[in-house]
């Protein structure tokens, strides 16, 4: 992988569908990619629409913004466990994590944790991005007018 041989190349997922996989899986994948890219990995997450969430991925539907908030918080709790040897104890409505054994703790990172960005179209997900994430990715249809009238207020 080219990112392993330079510090100038950023590696990111763009928008990976979050709810189709456990936050534990996303945390582990991101940790490994952060190590492999010399600390230049950004995890991009999106919620996907109800039809795909339920019928394509067979995941129960719930309001995406509160669930995405928990998803990001759970990933950060898992990373904190691995980086700082903090006991894992994340208890949310959608995700609960309380078990981490040494056999499943990845090798340490030599630097910062990965960044997290989420896809957002409306105000609720923008609020999650502002409060929990390192960045936001807007949909291609987000015109300046939409940004001014819907997302920013």
Question: What name fits each language-model region?
Answer:
Residues 1-153:
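Active-site-adjacent structural elements that line small-molecule/cofactor binding pockets in enzymes
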């Amino acid at each position: 992988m080219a990112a392993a041989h330079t510090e100038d190349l950023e590696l990111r997922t763009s928008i990976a569908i979050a709810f189709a996989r456990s936050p534990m899986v996303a945390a582990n994948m991101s940790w490994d990619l952060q190590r492999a890219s010399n600390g230049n990995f950004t995890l991009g997450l999106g919620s996907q629409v109800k039809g795909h969430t339920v019928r394509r991925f067979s995941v129960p539907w719930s309001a995406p913004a509160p669930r995405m908030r928990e998803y990001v918080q759970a990933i950060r709790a898992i990373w904190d466990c691995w980086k700082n040897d903090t006991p894992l104890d994340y208890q949310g409505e959608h995700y609960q994590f309380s078990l981490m054994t040494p056999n499943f703790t990845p090798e340490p990172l030599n630097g910062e944790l990965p960044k997290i960005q989420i896809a957002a179209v409306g105000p609720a997900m923008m609020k999650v991005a502002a409060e929990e994430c390192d960045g936001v990715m807007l949909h291609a249809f987000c015109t300046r007018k939409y940004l001014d009238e819907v997302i920013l207020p």
